[in-house]
Amino acid sequence: AFSAVGSLEGAYFKQFGKTVEFSEQQLVDCDKYSHACNGGLMTNGFIHWMRYAPRDESEYPYHIDPKSKCKEKQTSSNYEELRYGYRVDVGWECLYEALMHGPVSVAIRAENDEFRSYTGGIIDGDACGTDLDHGVTLVGYNADEDYWIVKNSWGEEWGENGYVRIRRGKDKGICGINQQNAQAVYNENEYVDFD
């Protein structure tokens, strides 16, 4: 949910010029194709927002409760439904191009010591693996030192104030970052199919 929300907030800002905080809890509670607190696919979140407009975080706040129920009917949305783009197995060049349109929701391999205990620096080894199990938000890159800048959902105490730097390149990418990604797009003219 956090990864998809990051991409959606970026797309909304690009289209409308307003900073918003959308509700992660809306997806956790209401996206019937995902698995609540046990995760799901970012594309399922985007599909949900195509049917039901996103809710504001202040109206539908995040809380940890595995028994939480969907409250979409009890809240209203001031936002438009979403148009979206979806990319799979596209490689680092296409991720770079997608970043020109805003933040990208990406899947990575996080269930490993290198990622879980990350405190700083650039992850550039094969210790991560490439079996995807976690969604994060790709927010930038450094061309000089050749790494991605990625926002995680584990709080500011983790990594570099909640962010991680991952080396670009390789087939599936370090921690599998090149394998699966999706990006929210509000404007039909912004949709680019990189497949």
Model-predicted segments: where are they?
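Catalytic-core signature of thiol
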Residues: 1-195
